[in-house]
């Protein structure tokens, strides 16, 4: 093996273990990839730029690279092979859309040996990472490569409409032929940068059937966990500020609808979690390895490649976290249920799955044995809905902000009413005091008072005769066109209208808001002498 490195979430193969894919050594595959891409991209620069046409999506270019070399190709120490490039002009457009220049693309892939990563999935694919952390190179099956070819026109249209997406960004599709074996590879964006240590990594589908990391996976230095592991570790989810949460969910919803329209399913959200509270300890204990300073974060060449760029702009809380730790590499700020500050890196992966006959059969027999709704293989529309529901309810949550303060307009209107309300209070207090004195001196009978109370109870729209109340309330009309709403609800107990035998009327409460006065009645148990508490004004 030419080179390996172990850092962050990148888990390379063991240095003394040579992997094979279709009976071909991984070192030979890596060498052929670099030679083939170096030749085809360099040859493409001589072709003039033009608009992409429909037939460009179906063009396949081929070149033969013998080990002894030719007048067009260099000599090499690998077996003879043929290198095919699919839709070269279309993929050149995709690279330009994301700001990838041909020289940068060649430098990233061909300047240094590729780094082989371990594969936590069940596909058996090989994964290679460029030394500058920019690109992932993955081997794909024939059906996946064929599906990507058919997907390209719609993929082109989607990227034109919205380059900010969590969907995989494909930069090239190639095929190496040697000894009757076809090895197809695709070049994609790297979701989890090695330069940022991932304390936790999850592969989430929204399914619970067999969605727990295996024992073998858990024994790895940097395992990739699954849905059930996430629900156990982060049972209360991950919290975002409102703006970031809305942008993230909007992006996920749009991406899932795009995948559903192409009848794609069985995709996952790859989620890397960097805990900022642990990063200082990590820096003290273990310095960053195998990532040259010139290629450290902040020098990304690819547009829309970071997680934060992919969800349509930063949230409000991003500034605070970036101020504390400027080396965020475009991670999305969040918090755990423990209050830990986090940076999240994410992207949708494994989208080259079409809901064809084999997938339908797979879901059918699994649904017979298990709960069909929990099986990861499902029809595209149901899969998208379940995926979004899981992300929205179990994984990503919005921090509930405190109730907003009143608007400036409301504050001004209340302040304006405050002075008038004081006049209403003093006027009504004095009138009621005089009325109570008159009632006691004139010896008004309790029977007549009961009749008055009874009448008010059957007619809740009526208020005991207090003319001065309306005269005082009319003062509020100088501020705005106020309305007086009256609602008196007397209990069946006759003593509620007057307290004890002193003839004290029930207290009234004014609620002042937006230029309107609401009058409600409550039983009063105050003494006659408590004039200051006769009227409560709530502002």
From Swiss-Prot:
<dbReference type="GO" id="GO:0006661">
    <property type="term" value="P:phosphatidylinositol biosynthetic process"/>
</dbReference>
<feature type="modified residue" description="Phosphoserine">
    <location>
        <position position="445"/>
    </location>
</feature>
<dbReference type="GO" id="GO:0012505">
    <property type="term" value="C:endomembrane system"/>
</dbReference>
<keyword id="KW-1003">Cell membrane</keyword>
<keyword id="KW-0547">Nucleotide-binding</keyword>
<keyword id="KW-0472">Membrane</keyword>
<keyword id="KW-0067">ATP-binding</keyword>
<protein>
    <recommendedName>
        <fullName>Phosphatidylinositol 4-phosphate 5-kinase type-1 beta</fullName>
        <ecNumber>2.7.1.68</ecNumber>
    </recommendedName>
</protein>
<dbReference type="GO" id="GO:0046488">
    <property type="term" value="P:phosphatidylinositol metabolic process"/>
</dbReference>
<dbReference type="GO" id="GO:0005524">
    <property type="term" value="F:ATP binding"/>
</dbReference>
<dbReference type="GO" id="GO:0016308">
    <property type="term" value="F:1-phosphatidylinositol-4-phosphate 5-kinase activity"/>
</dbReference>
<feature type="domain" description="PIPK">
    <location>
        <begin position="25"/>
        <end position="395"/>
    </location>
</feature>
<dbReference type="GO" id="GO:0005886">
    <property type="term" value="C:plasma membrane"/>
</dbReference>
<feature type="region of interest" description="Disordered">
    <location>
        <begin position="1"/>
        <end position="21"/>
    </location>
</feature>
<dbReference type="GO" id="GO:0005829">
    <property type="term" value="C:cytosol"/>
</dbReference>
<keyword id="KW-0963">Cytoplasm</keyword>
<keyword id="KW-0808">Transferase</keyword>
<dbReference type="GO" id="GO:0001931">
    <property type="term" value="C:uropod"/>
</dbReference>
<dbReference type="InterPro" id="IPR027483">
    <property type="entry name" value="PInositol-4-P-4/5-kinase_C_sf"/>
</dbReference>
<keyword id="KW-0418">Kinase</keyword>
<dbReference type="InterPro" id="IPR002498">
    <property type="entry name" value="PInositol-4-P-4/5-kinase_core"/>
</dbReference>
<comment type="function">
    <text>Catalyzes the phosphorylation of phosphatidylinositol 4-phosphate (PtdIns(4)P/PI4P) to form phosphatidylinositol 4,5-bisphosphate (PtdIns(4,5)P2/PIP2), a lipid second messenger that regulates several cellular processes such as signal transduction, vesicle trafficking, actin cytoskeleton dynamics, cell adhesion, and cell motility. PtdIns(4,5)P2 can directly act as a second messenger or can be utilized as a precursor to generate other second messengers: inositol 1,4,5-trisphosphate (IP3), diacylglycerol (DAG) or phosphatidylinositol-3,4,5-trisphosphate (PtdIns(3,4,5)P3/PIP3).</text>
</comment>
<comment type="subunit">
    <text>Interacts with RAC1, AJUBA, PLD1, PLD2 and ARF1.</text>
</comment>
<keyword id="KW-0443">Lipid metabolism</keyword>
<dbReference type="Pfam" id="PF01504">
    <property type="entry name" value="PIP5K"/>
</dbReference>
<dbReference type="InterPro" id="IPR027484">
    <property type="entry name" value="PInositol-4-P-5-kinase_N"/>
</dbReference>
<dbReference type="InterPro" id="IPR023610">
    <property type="entry name" value="PInositol-4/5-P-5/4-kinase"/>
</dbReference>
<feature type="modified residue" description="Phosphoserine">
    <location>
        <position position="448"/>
    </location>
</feature>
<feature type="modified residue" description="Phosphoserine">
    <location>
        <position position="447"/>
    </location>
</feature>
<keyword id="KW-0597">Phosphoprotein</keyword>
